[in-house]
Amino acid sequence: MSGLGGLNKSPNGVVMGMVQLQLPVTKTPADLAAQTARICDLVAKARRNMPGMDLVVFPEYALHGLSMDTNPDIMCRMDGPEVAAFTRACVQNKIWVCFSIMEFNPHGNPYNSGIIIDDQGALKLYYRKLHPWVPVEPWEPGDLGIPVCDGPNGSKIALIICHDGMFPEMARECAYKGAEIMIRTAGYTAPIRHSWKISNQANAFSNLMVTASVCMCGSDGTFDSMGEGMVVDFDGTLMVDGSHRPDEIITCEVRPDLVREARRVWGVENNIYQFGHRGYVAVKGGARDCPYTYMQDMVAGKYVLPWEKDVAVTDGTSCGFPVPTRGYQPQPVITEKRKYA
């Protein structure tokens, strides 16, 4: 039940608006400034559209479009004018918003980043995409882990970006750290439609967690993004889904309190608990070991597939990018919760 898209808001509900933003073309700093202003205008539209809305979500690539341009002149900085404008929009409209930016990285390729700013102008969540959509995307692999923040009306929220959601471990990490709502922003195009839907539903069901997901929408003359906003309840049931109409705002009320209840009282299919307590009917507390070889190997830095040497695509040359010469070096980052008047 979505409360008629949030029109009938319950005391424990969180009303979300998923913006199927028209795919932009951003080539210059002037284009970036214009798109920033457009997004801020849509924040105001969302507030006017539904006074009870708590959180608005913009898709991946909302500022930069799908060109994969790494030109530093159009990259964002956390202390730059784009984030400052977004913060003012949140304060002026008294609403929480999830934004997408391509973030300047002085040590390598830009990061594909997402931020959540609250209605008081505080930065609540700052995430860098862990799994760029290789070999198509040139972004630096994220180095901030998967943060979870306190959200509106007592909720717990995590953010992942696009291709991240194809890895079940990403959703499991969000839930393990307490997320009741997992936002997934994306720029996907039509060939991914089926995978998008089944992964959003599986991520919800497997973790007793609401998933709220949205793509860019429309055409930029080269690419066609699919829209396909969707909110899935914690049992895997589709609550609302969008069309292919650019700038449509899909709304839904979700209930974090019912997520918490299910995690406490469910027996059958309480998978997030049972994963670490195997066979608790037979043995007290269940088996608490880690029988998964790939997990042990990854921690040891020895993750190698049986067919590893036969994998054909291991860099971005097929998509026009040069062979990388740097190894992965995570950079120390200071994230500071700030408020803007």
What spans do the regions from the language model cover?
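Short beta->alpha transition motifs characteristic of CBS
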Residues: H64, N71, I115, Y126-W133, ...
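Cys-nucleophile CN-hydrolase/nitrilase-fold catalytic domain and related Cys-dependent amidase chemistry
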Residues: A30-D119, K124-Y126, T189-N207
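CN hydrolase (nitrilase-like) catalytic-core segments centered on the catalytic cysteine
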Residues: P81-C98, K156, M166-E253
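Active-site-proximal beta-strand/loop segments in catalytic clefts of secreted hydrolases
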Residues: V19-L21, E60-Y61, S100-M102, I161-H163, ...
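N-terminal active-site segment of His-dependent metallophosphoesterases
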Residues: M1-D54, I183
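Active-site catalytic loop in hydrolytic enzyme cores
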Residues: R88, N105-E180, T185-A202, S225, ...
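C-terminal beta-strand edge segments of enzyme domains
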Residues: G3, V148, V210, M216-A341
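Short, glycine-anchored, charge-dense loop/turn motifs used at functional sites
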Residues: M16, N112, I116-K124, M230-H244
